[in-house]
Every structure is written in structure tokens, then in C-alpha cells.
Amino acid sequence: MACGATLKRTLDFDPLLSPASPKRRRCAPLSAPTSAAASPSSAAAATAASFSAAAASPQKYLRMEPSPFGDVSSRLTTEQILYNIKQEYKRMQKRRHLETSFQQTDPCCTSDAQPHAFLLSGPASPGTPSATSSPLKKEQPLFTLRQVGMICERLLKEREEKVREEYEEILNTKLAEQYDAFVKFTHDQIMRRYGEQPASYVS
């Protein structure tokens, strides 16, 4: 006659009152013991696989970094551009004043300096006196100060965009050269180390 006894679990193993999970832990599978030194064929296959993966995905090696010009703002503000234009205009006026005073004090150089004064002031109209007779006359400006500032700002932006494009092109070229050198170096190392060994079924 067979009899069986049932054991009642204590509260520690009750799934409702136990803080731990009621599920049993799975046994971790025993890993097969690996040899201390791998066979040359397997090492060659692993190296060849890594080489093929690197050669097949150049974009992974040449990952596109964010452009260093992305967070760079314009160094010159509109107010600074206008201030520089004003200072340059004052220097030009002072230079013209010095040239006219030099011509008045030294009459022998008047004939030599006449073409230069003609270029600065432009040809005189028939109804007005010549530029040499009235060098300090007020000229009619072609552009306002704000218009000149807008022109200079636009030229600076165009120049900045051109420099940015040249930098990106040079950077991509250098990265491509580095990648080609990396591929060639890896291929030479594989051929030097495993080139003379016979091919196995793994490769």
C-alpha cells in the first residue's frame, strides 16, 4: 500500500507574501571549455570576417561628425560692420584731405597727382569746376550707410559659406584617404600573417 505525505509550504515561500519573484531561476547552461590557444584557421577566419565587415561598411568607419561651423555665429554684427564702415570712410576723407594739402604745398607734383585725383573724384561735368579747383566739394553718395552695411554683411555671409564648403570638401577627402590607408593596412596584415597557410573549410 502506497501512501504519500504532503508538506505545507511556509509563509516564506508563499508567492503572495514573499517579496521575491515566485518564478524559479533557470539554470544557466554550462559553456563549453575553450582552448587556450585558438587554431590558426579560426583566427584567420575571424580576422578575415572583421576585415570584410570593415570594408563592406565604409560609412560606419567614416561616420559623419557634426560640422564645426554649425554652432558658430557671425563674428561681426550689423552694428560692428556699420562702425567699421564709418571708420574707413573717415580715414578715406582724411587721406584725401592730406593729398589735397600736399598738392597745394608742392605744385611741382600737381601734374603727377592729377590722374589719381581724377580717379578719386571722377570726371567733372561741363558746368562745374574741375576736381582740382574744388577738391573739398561735397560728393553725392550713391548708397546710404545702411545700404553699404547690408552689402558688406551679404558679402561676408557669401564668403563664410564658401569657406565652409571648402572645409567640408577637404575634410571628406582626408577622411577618405584615412579609410583607404586603413583598408590597405588591414589587408597587408592579413596577407602577411595568414597568406601562406592553407585555406580551411571555415574560410
Swiss-Prot record:
One of its GO terms (cellular component) is cytoplasm. The keyword Iron does not apply. InterPro entries: Akirin. The modification Phosphoserine is found at S18, S21, S57. The keyword Cytoplasm applies. Its main location: nucleus. A motif (SYVS motif) lies at residues 200-203. Homodimer. Interacts with IPO9; the interaction is direct. Associates with 20S and 26S proteasomes. Interacts with SMARCD1; promoting SWI/SNF complex recruitment. Interacts with NFKBIZ. Interacts with YWHAB. Belongs to the akirin family. PANTHER family: AKIRIN-2 (PTHR13293:SF8), AKIRIN-RELATED (PTHR13293). This is Akirin-2. It comes from Sus scrofa.
